[in-house]
Amino acid sequence: EPSIPSATNRRVISYRLTLAAPAVLSMVGGETSTVDTRPCISGSTVLGTLAWRWLGQQRPACADPAGNPEFRRFFLDGSVRWLNAYAESQNGKRLLPCPLSMVRRKNELDLAFDQASPFFEDQVKEEPNTQWKPLDLPFVRLKETEDAEGMVFRLRGLQPKSTTRLHHTRDDREAGRSKNGVMFSYVALDAGERFIGHILCET
């Protein structure tokens, strides 16, 4: 996409990623028998992938990548910052991680309220019987508007599609099967999921 001008001497380059195949971007921690996946593509993953591709194109001419000024500028010295690629909304916008402080009324999906707001306490007092629920969405786009309820957020959210697959462990290498029927699962982002990321670089 065209670069976005910045108020500083840096520019923002937007890029889109579409998964051509299911992707597992494993997260640290969790159950030992389950491999969960991140709901976004981290900037470090994008950096590593493009650095590997750059090296593949430059070999064998670039024998010492760490000593190559171009490689250092793109991938090592911080001149270029690779930001996370987050889910793309239905209208082609980059969504952002949902703040933990955002909640909604039970059974109401299009309005969100910020518990960190100094006015939220008044909202709770005015609605003593309201049940407040976390948004439970990894990515959202919030548009602040004013209506009869005061300042509220119109909510647009997205949960990237993923699939969980089950497999037997293969601790019996010769037979190629599990000795005790032990299974493990992994979660993969589905092929076709779209993401938008940003690259910050000098003008």
Q: What residues fall within each predicted segment?
A:
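Conserved active-site/ligand-binding neighborhood in enzyme cores
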Residues: 1-203
